[in-house]
């Protein structure tokens, strides 16, 4: 995976809404009754489409090049290996003279994002643990899809996990040093990255023997729930790979994830390596810096706990 700043392609929200309506009508062959903006990150923008017959889909625009094949491939692959709903890709469309960005249509998962549900957040410990049980059972199903090589789902060629991951992590550190030298990255972040890198061979001393399919961005914000606070689906994979399955676990501690005992539940049910805690600390820190390098956005309420956790885990070595 390339570690570099990506400039988002301009896409006016008003124009995008009209594009979504036109494309949905063309691709599905039904008149559109309503279009609603659902949200988006640095490089995506999603719209809910309601047709006259009340069927609903989502059209997602990709504001960076070379994302379309990867995203649609990974959604289909994950959906085929997960008992919980992951949106089925309905169509894809490359950028052209009419629409300046790539896009695709997919199924709508009804419900709401788990991170915004106060009802779920404040529910009893029993219900939160039940939610964790449902999530981790589904994740283990994804992880049960294995490959004979490690690496990107589109091209996995590595015999060992670290043959893929160590050069990738080193790229992140090199780019982070460049950003720090320009005064763009806080000193506390680069210092803890350096300290963690010095201990890399210890942190990753346990051999990863299985190349497991991972979601890549498995945090509470990418879990959907229904009106009864039951798990209804997963969305937005990022850089899905055949990888160390524990790479999917660091996101469980981000945002409000700890409230649901997600990582604890997974480890209790399926086990983990002896160094899982410090590996997840490393994965989490370097992933967040990677996201910053790509987008230029440093999210303090995510980054600061990752820095603190990495310091704690290094002190425990």
What is the role of each PLM region?
Residues 210-214, 219-278:
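Active-site Asp-x-Gly
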Residues 30-35, 186-190, 272-280:
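Short, surface-exposed acidic
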Residues 12-31, 125-133, 141-216, 226, ...:
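An alpha-helical support segment within catalytic cores of ATP-dependent transferases
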Residues 58-62, 90-91, 154, 213-216, ...:
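Short beta-strand segments
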Residues 131-134, 189, 217, 245, ...:
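An acidic site on a long C-lobe helix of protein kinase domains
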Residues 34-156, 163:
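ATP-binding pocket architecture of kinase catalytic cores
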Residues 40, 133, 250-317:
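Helix-rich C-terminal or lid/interface subdomains of diverse kinases
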Residues 4-14, 63:
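A short, highly charged nucleic-acid-interacting micro-segment common to nuclease
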């Amino acid at each position: 995976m390339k570690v570099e700043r990506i400039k988002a392609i301009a896409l006016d929200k008003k124009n995008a809404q009209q594009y979504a309506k036109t494309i949905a009508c063309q691709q599905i062959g039904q008149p559109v009754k309503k279009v609603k903006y659902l949200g988006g990150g640095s490089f995506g923008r999603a719209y809910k489409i309601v047709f006259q017959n009340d069927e609903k889909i989502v059209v997602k625009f990709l504001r960076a090049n070379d994302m379309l094949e990867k995203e649609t491939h990974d959604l289909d692959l994950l959906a085929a290996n997960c008992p919980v709903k992951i949106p089925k890709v309905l169509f894809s469309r490359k950028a052209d003279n009419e629409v300046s960005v790539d896009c695709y249509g997919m199924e709508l998962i009804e419900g709401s994002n788990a991170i915004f549900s106060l009802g779920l957040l404040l529910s009893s410990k029993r219900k939160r643990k039940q939610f964790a049980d449902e999530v981790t059972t589904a994740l283990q199903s994804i992880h049960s899809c294995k490959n004979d090589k490690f690496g990107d789902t589109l091209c996995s060629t590595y015999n060992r996990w670290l043959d893929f991951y160590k050069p990738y992590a080193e790229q992140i550190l090199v780019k982070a040093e460049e950003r720090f030298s320009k005064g763009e990255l806080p000193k506390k972040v680069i210092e803890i990255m350096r300290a963690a890198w010095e201990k890399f061979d210890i942190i990753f001393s346990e051999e990863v023997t299985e190349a497991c399919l991972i979601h890549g961005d498995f945090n509470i914000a990418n879990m959907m729930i229904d009106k009864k606070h039951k798990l209804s689906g997963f969305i937005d994979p990022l850089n899905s790979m055949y990888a160390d399955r524990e790479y999917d676990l660091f996101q469980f501690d981000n945002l409000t994830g700890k409230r649901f005992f997600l990582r604890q539940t997974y480890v209790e049910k399926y086990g983990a390596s002896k160094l899982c805690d410090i590996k997840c600390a490393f994965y989490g820190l370097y992933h967040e810096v990677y996201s910053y390098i790509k987008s230029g956005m440093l999210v303090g309420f995510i980054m600061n706990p990752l820095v603190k956790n990495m310091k704690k885990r290094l002190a425990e070595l």
